[in-house]
Amino acid sequence: MIKKIGVLTSGGDAPGMNAAIRGVVRAALTEGLEVFGVYDGYLGLYEDRMVQLDRYSVSDMINRGGTFLGSARFPEFRDEHVREVAIENMKKRGLDALVVIGGDGSYMGAKRLTEMGFPCIGLPGTIDNDIKGTDYTIGFFTALGTVVEAIDRLRDTSSSHQRISIVEVMGRYCGDLTLAAAIAGGCEFIVVPEVEFSREDLVAEIKAGIAKGKKHAIVAITEHICDVDELAKYIEAETKRETRATVLGHIQRGGSPGPYDRILASRMGAYAIDLLLQGHGGRCVGIQNEKLVHHDIIDAIENMKRPFKGDWLDCAKKLY
C-alpha cells in the first residue's frame, strides 16, 4: 500500500517541469498520500536532501519555467553502492515509490532503482522530444515556440541584408525540435541527425534557390552535426552570399511553459499517482494520439524504437 512518495527532476531542465511536480503533489495529496520533494535530482537523493511538500509548496508554480526542486547531472548514480545509499535514504523517510521527471538519462536511473526493487514512475521531461513511448515530451512545445520566435527575428534581418542564416537548434541526437521549428518558421533548408548530411549537397540546394531568385535563406540544423561557424564560412565561400550562424543555446530551455505543456505536465503528473495507486511500478508515462499511456520502463529503454517523423520532413521539402 502506497502511503509516501518522492518526486524529483533530473537532467536538463524543461518548461513544464514545475507543472508536472505540481500535478504529482496535488494529485497525491488528494488521494491522502504524503509527498517529499528531492532537491537536485539523483544527487539530492544520494545526499538525503528532501523536504515534505504540501499544496502551498506548489502554489504559483504552474506558470514558472525551470524546476524549483533543482536538477543536477550525477553520473556517479551508475554505481550500485551509490544507488543503495539513495534507496536507504528513501526508506528511512518511509517512501514507498519515486516519481522521476526527466529525459532518457533520468529514465535509466529510474530503471536501475526499479531493478533493485524500488518502484519508480518516469515522466518525460525534456525539450528534445527524444523519449520512447510518447508522441511528445513535457517542454517540447514551449521550446518550439522559443525557437520559432528566434527564426522569425532572424528572417527579418536576413531579408534586410539578403543574408543566409544558419540557426542551431537543441535536440541532441533527435531532430524533432529542428524539424518542427523549421516547418513553423518556414526555413528553406533542414539538417537533422536522422538524415545523412552533406555540406556539398546543402550548398547545391542553396545555389538552386538563388538561381530561382531567392534573396535570403534560413538553414535549421540540429546541434552536434557539425561546427555551424565553419559551415557558415563554407557556404559563404561557395555561394558568395553573406552567411552567419546563430547558436540558440540554453535560451531554448527557459521561459514560462505554454498552455499545452502545462496541460500535458498536469495530466501526466496526476496519471503517475493513478498508476502507483493501482499497484504499477517501473512504468513510464507517455501520450499517444492524445491519450495517456504507460509502458514498462525497462522495455521502453532497451527495446522500443522512437520513429522519425519522416512525413514531416517530406512536407517541409515540398514547401521550400
Curated annotation (Swiss-Prot):
Disulfide bond residue pairs: none
Pathway: Carbohydrate degradation; glycolysis; D-glyceraldehyde 3-phosphate and glycerone phosphate from D-glucose: step 3/4
Catalytic site positions: 128
Binding, Mg(2+): 104
Subcellular location: Cytoplasm
Main location: cytoplasm
Name the record gives this protein: ATP-dependent 6-phosphofructokinase
Species the sequence originates in: Enterobacter cloacae
Organismal lineage: Bacteria, Pseudomonadati, Pseudomonadota, Gammaproteobacteria, Enterobacterales
